């Protein structure tokens, strides 16, 4: 997923389909006070090969949900966003379900387009180390560009959260956990379109 910002900067991150035209990602992928707030354009690519060629088509995305407290306070407990695509590609490609029940020790994985390996899909596999509060902490490797990717449980093959990155003062990575409130929002937007 690539963003072009009002100040002319560009960036990329990872998102994942959770409905026919619904994409989940991290809020910090699609909102940046430093770059002018909201992106002037967001393009979603279902896949990119290692030569930089887009696999399939690209799709225009618009922000459907971005928590207000993330915008005003950079509240990391609200570091998630939902986007709407201009096509129901999930009906063809499929999409991830999600889970609100996660246990310490569950095997999990992250996939995304790591910044130092541009145009290559990378996966990190690890274990859930903590489920307390609003976050999941885990041992899977993450890198710039993988932000917004699903924290998915490998046995259930369901998303349990949104990858953020390194946890301050720890060797673990972390992301926002899909709790019942976020799951309700996801159900609402998935069924709205």
What are these regions (language model features)?
Residues 50, 61, 76-146, 171-179:
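Chymotrypsin/trypsin-fold serine protease catalytic domain
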Residues 141-163:
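Catalytic nucleophile loop of clan PA
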